[in-house]
């Protein structure tokens, strides 16, 4: 999934020097954060949200190393403030449960659509959502607490599998935490209590339960 990566404008304009021809006061390369982000997004761009990575340990290691670079860049930032509130759309993960549902959806005559994390920091709510267009959805409701500048604790409180004219409540199951090791206006990179990784972008819409 392509994301637009903005480069800072170069100023002043190009000027000729005696020794080196044209020169500019800004680098033709992006800054370190932009380079690391671009590399990470390129690495995951053909990985089918992580399905292909499961069968390619070398590629997984490359992606994890790129995530570690993003972790260093984001280590002093606050990633649990109001800017965390958003509908986040899955780009890539190592989480086996999510990947299993995405991969096996065809066995039930459907395909997985967007996979989302819907977070509201002020209301202390997290919904994990897997959509099955046009009418199906599986979502897990959770309560959250902000534990640190980058860590969020969560506790599942209910789950629902819903179709067009039916709904199947499921029992809640467990608790844990995740750390947002990097976040900006476009993407978020997280690592959870089990050592799984998640890369998401800000969806172009806000998901609510009224969508289904």
From Swiss-Prot:
Compartmental location: Plastid, Chloroplast thylakoid
Classification via PANTHER family: PLASTID-LIPID-ASSOCIATED PROTEIN 4, CHLOROPLASTIC-RELATED (PTHR31906)
Main subcellular localisation: plastid
Stretch forming the transit peptide: 1-25
Pfam family membership, one: PAP_fibrillin
InterPro entries: PAP, PAP/fibrillin_dom
Keywords: Chloroplast, Plastid, Thylakoid, Transit peptide
Transmembrane segments: none
Annotated protein name in UniProt: Probable plastid-lipid-associated protein 11, chloroplastic
A single GO cellular-component term on record: chloroplast thylakoid
Name of the gene: PAP11
Protein family membership: Belongs to the PAP/fibrillin family.
């Amino acid at each position: 999934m392509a994301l637009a990566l903005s480069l800072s404008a170069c100023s002043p304009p190009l000027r000729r020097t005696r020794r080196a021809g044209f020169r500019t006061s800004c680098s033709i390369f992006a800054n370190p954060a932009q380079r690391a982000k671009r590399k990470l997004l390129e690495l995951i761009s053909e990985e089918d949200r992580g399905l292909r990575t499961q069968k390619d340990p070398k590629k997984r290691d490359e992606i994890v190393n790129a995530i570690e670079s993003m972790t260093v860049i984001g280590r002093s930032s606050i990633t649990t403030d109001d800017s965390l509130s958003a509908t986040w759309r899955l780009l890539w993960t190592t989480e086996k449960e999510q990947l299993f549902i995405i991969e096996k959806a065809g066995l039930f005559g459907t395909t997985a659509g967007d996979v989302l994390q819907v977070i509201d920091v002020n209301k202390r709510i997290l919904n994990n959502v897997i959509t099955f267009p046009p009418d199906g959805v599986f979502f897990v409701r959770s309560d959250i607490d902000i534990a640190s500048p980058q860590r969020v604790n969560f506790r599942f409180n209910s789950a629902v599998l819903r179709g067009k004219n039916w709904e199947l409540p499921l029992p809640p199951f467990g608790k844990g935490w995740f750390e947002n090791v990097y976040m900006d206006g476009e993407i978020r990179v997280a690592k959870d209590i089990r050592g799984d990784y998640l890369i998401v972008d800000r969806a172009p819409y806000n998901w609510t339960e009224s969508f289904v």
